[in-house]
Amino acid sequence: MHKLLKILLAGLVCLGSMVPAFADESAGVLPCTLTAENGTPVWQLSDQNRSTKLDWSGGTLTVESTEPITGLYLIWDRPPEPWTGTAGSQTLSGGEYGFLHEYFPLESPVTRAELTLPEGSRCCDVYAFGEGELPDWVQQWQPPLADADLLVLPTHADDEHLFFGGTMPYYAGELGKKVQVVYFTNHWAEPYRPHELLDGLWTVGIRNYPVMSSFVDQYADSLDYARTLYDEEEAVAWQVQQLRRFKPEVVVGHDVNGEYGHGVHMYNADTLMQALELSADPSYDPESAQKWGVWDVPKTYLHLWPENPIVMDWSQPLSAFGGKTAVEMARLGFAEHVSQQTFFKVEDYGPYDCRKFGLYRSLVGLDAQGGDFFENLAAGDYSDYLPPEPEPEPEPVSEPEPERTRTLPGWTLLAGMVGAVALAEGMILYGRRRKR
């Protein structure tokens, strides 16, 4: 009887250790073969290294695996042109929004997919995934917003974390507001930085793809010098276009002194301030007024603006991020900018304190409470854009679901073992009493 009890207990321990594995299954990267149309292996796209890339010469890329593929993930070096492909009976289409990181869930598992990529496109990696939950690092971007609650206007990739701190994790990740990020410069001359940009945004809860301007990243040590680098009329018009396109209730911009004195930060703030006075005027840039309509931003905050100051509380735990605070998430977002890990860091203290902002412009009065960019804005004032709801599919007629114990044989076995252990223990105790 003691031997039986030991066997049952051992089986119970083994079964218990298997339960977390069932609950923790996730999709892994599948081993796959990538070949060009002429049959040549394309190793550059399967090394999981963004620094190796391939200039596609045209034709079809074939992705094959011995295991069922349920999703494909493409990493581009530059925004791709539209492209198509097939995976079984499913037609794939990509490149519509120029996403550098594109994920495609497949309707049915396949072991072979064919992608017709544009000639001259430059790709870094192609991943195939199997059944299960995708890893957190796989980014499933949505297009830029048609209507934003909050527009964040950093100058460079990493400024959004360094100087705007917990803005994105708190408002986008925790509160679920529609946050659009628009960068004044681009980093195409440093091809690793756009990837870092996307990784950082994804980390802090941004899900709508960012906008990157056509202005090349350059350094200036003053506002006057920055004005020699860019066409100011073009820059102001671009700022107006962003305000009209996204129609934000709140805009967050840079310090007019450029935080640590960066002239292009100053220039971004200066052209934004000009644009705020022009975006509601239909006679200014009539082409964008015709395309998007005009817009007068209700509230604008600038980093470190001395008037009407507020100090944001980025120290509260956020349930959306497992209890991490907004400033902790900002630091994790900045950590994705591997190339920028020098002497800058996200600081919630000191001269560049990422918590400190000032209400530069308001159509709804001054803040009384402070600590919330949306103070004095009622819920009806924003989030007024709703995407069209899909037509509901008719519910299929189905048989009643079987009992849960039938669909979870492991738990049935577990319950049986527990009962057997209890019975065995009772028999042992009964035998001992009889001997006494």
Describe each PLM feature range:
Residues 16-19, 169-171:
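Residues in and immediately flanking transmembrane alpha helices
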Residues 7, 20, 417-419:
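Short, intrinsically disordered, low-complexity terminal segments
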Residues 25-53, 76, 88, 102-106, ...:
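The feature marks non-catalytic terminal segments
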Residues 417-436:
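C-terminal membrane-anchoring or membrane-association module
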Residues 2-10:
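Sec-dependent signal peptide recognition
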Residues 13-17, 423:
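Hydrophobic core
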Residues 17-26, 403-411, 429-433:
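Sec-dependent signal peptide cleavage junction
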Residues 27-61, 65-285:
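Active-site beta-strand->loop->alpha-helix modules in alpha/beta enzyme cores, enriched
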